[in-house]
Structures are given as C-alpha cells and as structure tokens.
C-alpha cells in the first residue's frame, strides 16, 4: 500500500526546515530523517510510524492511541504505530511529529 501523500505533506509542514532533515521512501512509506535517524514515517491509510525513546514506549502505549510496531511478528523497540483517526488534526499530529523529531535529533548523526 502506498503512503498517504496528504499526510506526508502535513508532516513536512510541521517539521519545517529543521537542520539535517531528509526524506526517504522505505517500506512502502515516506520516512522523515533527522541527522540520518528516522523520526517519523507516513504510511498507507493515514497511519504514521513514530520513533520514540524505547523507555517511553510502554507508557505511551498505555496512555495514548499508539500501538507497538511489529515487523515480521516481532515488536520493534522504540517504534509505535498510530492510526489515522488519532492524527486527523494538526495539533495531534504535531505532538507525534515533535516526539519523533526530538528523539531522532537526540541520537548521534549517521
């Protein structure tokens, strides 16, 4: 399934002109990287994937609409999936964009 281009545009606008920001198509989505580290990705159906501090994954799953990201039946530490309905407005999407961008920016550049 192709990524949601309208959602990618919203993410792009929210990220603005941050230093080290690049985009890369991967896994059928469009990933936004900061310093070479994935921060957030637009995927199909209006869903997003967000990179967070692995220590924050469980608390975020417990208190937000996020779910653990799974790949090939295995949970990916520090990655969360957020369904379209939870990011339908820019304020909600902006919170997730900031979470992902903040964590990616805290990592050493690649």
Task: Mark where each language-model region is.
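Charge-dense, helix-prone N-terminal extensions
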Residues: 1-110
């Amino acid at each position: 399934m192709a990524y949601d281009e309208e959602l990618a545009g919203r993410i792009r606008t929210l990220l603005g002109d941050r230093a080290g920001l690049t985009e890369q198509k991967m896994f059928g989505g469009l990933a936004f990287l900061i310093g070479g580290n994935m921060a957030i990705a637009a995927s199909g159906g209006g869903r997003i994937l967000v990179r967070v501090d692995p220590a924050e994954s469980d608390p975020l799953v417990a208190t937000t609409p996020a779910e653990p990201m799974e790949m090939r039946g295995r949970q990916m530490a520090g990655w969360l999936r957020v369904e379209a309905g939870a990011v339908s407005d820019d304020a909600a999407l902006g919170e997730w964009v900031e979470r992902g961008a903040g964590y990616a920016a805290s990592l050493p550049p690649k």
